[in-house]
Swiss-Prot record:
Gene that this polypeptide is encoded by: mutL
GO molecular function, one term: ATP hydrolysis activity
Protein name: DNA mismatch repair protein MutL
Record-linked Pfam families: DNA_mis_repair, HATPase_c_3, MutL_C
Biological process per Gene Ontology, one example term: mismatch repair
Amino acid sequence: MPSRPLIQLLDTTTINQIAAGEVIENSISVVKELVENALDAGADEIEVETLGGGQGLIVVKDNGCGMSAEDVTLALKRHATSKIGEFSDIFSLSSFGFRGEALPAIASISKMEILSCPRIGEGSRTIIHGGEIIASEAKPRQLGTTISIDSLFYNVPVRRGFQKSPQADRIAMRKLLENRILSIEGVGWSWVSERQQEFHILKHRGFAERVGFVMGEGFMQEALRVDSGERPVCVRGFLGSPGFHRPTRSGQRVFINDRPVDSVFISKQIREAYSMLLPPQRHPVFVLKLYLPPEWCDFNVHPQKTEVRILKEEFVGEFLSESIGEVLARPQESSVSEKTIFSLPALRFFDEHLAERSSVEPLESISLPELSIPPKVPLPFLDKGQDIPTTDGQMQIDWGVSQEVRFLTSLGKIVLAEDSEGVHAIFTEAARKHLFYLALTENQQYNYKSQSFLVPLCLEVTPQEGIFLSSHVEDFKQLGIELSQMGPCIFAIDSAPTFIGEEELKSWILFLAAESHAKVDRKAVALLIKETLTQTVFCKTLRPFDISWLSLLWQIGKPEKAFDGTQIRRLVLDEDFIKE
């Protein structure tokens, strides 16, 4: 009996599922491929609907050229495409797709329905499960194609187990669609998520209006227009003013030949053009469309085509640096006319609701659940407390809070205390900060005052940051910060604790949203909120150290290190330390 060959030919379904592992990572990859197919089909109206961040349902509807039933069958075969005829066509691509892998790959890991009608001929409906066509029939439809994806990864449970949360996919989905809004003008876009309209952009909206929608009015009010060079090498777009910057590169949108790309090279060139205009570790915000000869660009680096190799990188770098440098050297006034900006409803919406919100009664002080620490001890920095009288630079206090530890003296920012183990040096700044952080994270039963603003503070954020803030409203509320969403990108701060100023509060929330909007671990984000709030409060605040807080340190185990690694306590073993 002949033995079975070691080398086996894979069946078509397995081949497509393997290809899907490279092309289709998640629901965002599916939508990306489907909307690119719609654009390549000449559509100027594209509608997207998702449920569960796309993990439950994806529907992409377009008014492109459509397909006959025969074309649909061919399109489901691997490496069947209408976009190239031979390999050399790859180096002069004008379409977004060309491999002919995406549709069969998606079909192999989902339950798919394709409803399509060409310009000449009748419409058809094709149902595919796991890559196999199970039904095909004539079905009326207007010109165009509708593709519905249900049960993504239903037959690849391992892949399904690695999917992120629906909330994370929703945030990434929005960025994907925003990039398409910016990259291609003359196309109308609609997105319905969780059965609610997220946006509807009319196709006649110009580039400046689209940038205003995606980046917000705050960006556009001081944006600097870039329009340098002529085809085939040119750059156009908008730069944020040097005063408009972020802690990460999340506010940067780069397009090369209308393809959204993530280019560290281009970001670095533009950051260097800003040079000393930005504070350290801050990044400029911009939307730039760079056009280069097709033969200079290789988008075939990765199946998702978000990376690009540039043939004449040095020339392109110099061109960008000079173009951006010239714009930044101009008198810094916004080069965008107010008339060119898409009239966003956000601020008007905020004004309409201001009257009904301005009469909010002051909130009761916020209570946090109990730990066994004497309630008479004030929480560090929640309350200024009483200044401790000093004589010759040393604190004089009637110590009686704890029998475990005894206050000795104060040496500037260091307090010396003694217990059965010996003499301890307490670094007061780190101790105060750590106790404050514990008060937030451990939910101790202490009250601190929360103030309600007569006129709520207004925050404008990006849509992705808006999704992040709206999903963590309860985490802010636990800290006495009341956030109300007034629109996709507008939030009102109704109340906040008295231990943080208004400008510090706004800056902290904006920083947090920009830094953390892509994070999905709710517990980690909740801790990050408290940690960054602690750092913000202590960065600006210098208040006297209450000696009674020593008792708290001992009751929590007299820690040596604070939550951020700074030293709180050190055992004094010799006189050299005191001299330091």
